Amino acid sequence: MFDPSPARLPVTETPQIVVVGCGAIGLPLATAFAARGCDVLGVDTDPARLAALRAGRVGLIDEGLGDALATAVGAGRLAFTDTIAPADRPRAFILVVPTPVDTDGAPLLGNVEAGADAIVAAARDDDLLLVRATVPVGTTRRLAGIAAKQGRRLHLAACPDRSVAGRCFLEQFSVPHIVGGMNADATHAAVQLLARLGPTVAVSSPEVAEAAKLFANVQRDVTFALANQLALASDELALDFGEIVAAASEGYARFALARPGPVSGPCLTKDGALLAHSLSADRFGLARAARALNESLLDHVAQALARHVSALPRPVIAVLGLAFKGDPPTADRRGSFGVALADRLRADLAHATLRLGEPTSGQAAERDLDRAIAGADVAVIANDHPLIKALDPSWLARSLRGGGLIYDACCALAPVAQALPNAVTLRRIGGHFPAAMASKRAR
């Protein structure tokens, strides 16, 4: 492993930590540093978010974060502002802003560039600028060039966040932080900083750190796509995917598959595009095909639902699960399969009534899963929140209209050994999936 030993120590006193971007990733990170006793300033441009944070209110679902934020704000270790002002003390700036892509998959790096400009304008020489955002390979080095052109000598390093939504705060202390600086001094400064939270892995350059995050997410997208492809093949062959998987894996450790289902959210849906932007277009066919396959599940499910309700004059469809994933719970709906499915059904089935259910919703009506299900013709399981996953298929069947359909898009519900009451059909992509393998879906 790369040795980050510096020629000299660039930080000689405890720096103030300035986290630029206090959303779903930046806020848990800022709070984690404050929980370790650091002096932290969070910067964000959203007035409503700032007002809530100054009052110690989280505004998102993340295990352990609420209490830690209230404690840090109350103790004066964590404050918030909308601007970055110059200071007469060393500071470590951490850039944690969204990096979306456009409809063609091209990265939109305006947030990164604006944040970096604001940091460079306020920083002192030898301050640390740590790029925590997920960016195309080479972005940190480009930002170093921008800082140099403005006459600022900063220590730049990359360390993309790798935590899981819903457990981002806790994973700051457990998931290794992959750190790559522009030189040994920058790497050392970043390692010193992040070692306050948890384990670190020093690498030889920011490009290695940037690529490590993107490679991992592309691997997961491809892994899920393979499971989905084989599950769809099982459907076409009229075979039970779960039975095939159980038989093929019995006493045979060389075979393992993820659980099929939607692959959504703000990361896996676009990180492949960020990596592709760093490469020649003709070198990324497998990952592009995997992303297209995963996105095709929306068509597959929507068409199956349309066929089921085609003869009904006023069908009622309940979509359960609007967050992009359910376990660990999150309220984040960016890139959500459930939201996209609801939008698609509204467009394709104008005569249908949609009911939406989401346990993490701020709206009481959406949290009431019983209300969404009662008397519906179809119930779609669109994420694996524990409260949704715990629904008994037989109870669901009795709650639906006779001849109804339960479409478990996530393969989250318990297996059913016999016919369901009320002439209700339970359908999954590829059939059932062995319960013992369900944990392999976590992301």
Question: Language-model segments: which ranges?
Answer:
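Structural/interface elements that position substrates and couple domains in central-metabolism enzymes
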Residues: 2-443
